[in-house]
Amino acid sequence: MDEVDKIIMHQLHQVDATIEPTDELSDFTPEQVVRAVSGCLAEIRPDLQLPRTLPGGAMAQRFGVASSLAQGCKDSGYRGDIGYQTFLYPNAVELRRLLMFLIEQLPRERQGTEDGASKSQTLSHRQLLERKIRKELAQQLKTPWVPQFARSVGNRKLLGCSSLGIEFRPNINLNIPSANPEERSKEQQQYLDQQAPNLFQQTSSTSTDLIASVLHKNELDRWGQILPDSTLIFVSSEDPAPPLIPTVKPPASAEKEEEPSPIQELSDQVQELRVQCENLLAERKAHAVAIAALKQRETKAREEISRIQPTLKLHERTSLVLADSEENLAKLEALLKSTQSKRLTLTQQWQDYRKPLLESLEKLKTAKEAQEVQGIRNSIEQLEQELLAKTQQHNELNATLRSASQSLAPRKEYTRRIHEFIGNIRKQRADIYKVLDDTRQLQKQLNVVGAQLQRQFNYTDDLLFQSAKHDLHAKRAYKLLAQLHANCNELVECVSLTGNVTKQIRELEVQIDGEKLKNVLTSLQQITGDIQKFEQHIQELQEQIRAVEQTNAGS
């Protein structure tokens, strides 16, 4: 079992690197068992909140931690015998069985999820934005769609009764353009595409409904020519919406002439509007060109002004100076002399103030250079010490690696041994199946022979019974046959009892071997020590209670 224990230790070290490796599982302490099992359960079921260490204080806490881990193993599907004793008094056989089960239950994609988590931490802002957009769209697609007529549903109450109030009032002045684009001019089409409100915008208010407005518009188009004028006036009593295309009133002279057809009148109006629109567009272009030219001239003028202003200011100052030249020259000479003397004074003051500062600066530079040199020397010494320590550690690790490579079998050796174990198991399974087949064949043969013997016995018994009525020798032979049959039955019973006893003996031997492997003596010693700790704790509590009672009695 040494190879199995090494494989288990290797898997546990991958799960939790803080687990101290041991040569065998029998050397595991209760603290190591708790850490290993809790680490495996944390990988299998991350939702479980289990303690990772075994407290070293009161025994009640240790029992609680062990019981919670045992319950977690049972919830994970472990069907073996497990309890707090498995963790507080570990047994190599039971512990090996438990750890093998937990290692088999470890998720295979654990490494993949770690890589995925590291990749998710390096996502760009664009990828995060795309992920957020996908999440928002998926959430919006899951929300139910509410029709337009049900979005303004209110709950009305009247005289103790409640009902849903849904408004279906139409928009009387609904403007629906024609479906044929050839009937519209270019300007009308541009207006409809860019500025005209659509059906949803015209019925967006809560007082009108889209379906009712469309139906009302269809009825008006259908029956508008048939209804009387009074009805149409009543229908259009509300405030009319502005039409999409303004109408043009005909001149007064045209009214006196013969009234043209409606189509001709509309075409004339459209033609007139088109001419007006073209004229307005031409005027607009001309005005735009003029405005651009004026803006360009304005820009040039501003640039010229900004360029001339410095020269103008200089000329103004020069003219002021030349107005009284002698007096201004005397003032300038006096100002120049005072400025020179002031400059000399400031230069002398600056030199007097600068000299000690330069000396202190040189001293500080020298001190800083010396400090830097000393720091470099200290860092060099520290690096040399670290280099020696790293070299020594490197040599120790090399020695450890050589010893480990010599003492531990390589991975290929483990794989080869595992394949050998699997081959032996398959061979044993084949042998077991062969023994079972032989047992079945033998059982069939025994059943056949038993049936033949039973038939022979019945036939012989019938013949001898018929002959015993007339022959004394046949009567004696019949008695001997009955005695032989009874003796044979006793022999069969003895053989069956012997087989059962042998089977029970083998089961007891296996159970004895299992109990020997459990180290019952060591477990009993640990339990005895824990009981003594409990007794000491109980005595301490009793003494504390007596002290409190005496204090209360004295007071």
UniProtKB/Swiss-Prot annotation:
Residues 263-406, 500-555 form a coiled coil. The keyword Membrane does not apply. It comes from the Eukaryota. One of its GO terms (molecular function) is cullin family protein binding. InterPro entries: CCDC22 (IPR008530), CCDC22_CC (IPR048348), CCDC22_N (IPR048349). GO terms for biological process: positive regulation of ubiquitin-dependent protein catabolic process. Keywords: Coiled coil. Belongs to the CCDC22 family. This is Coiled-coil domain-containing protein 22 homolog. It comes from Drosophila melanogaster.
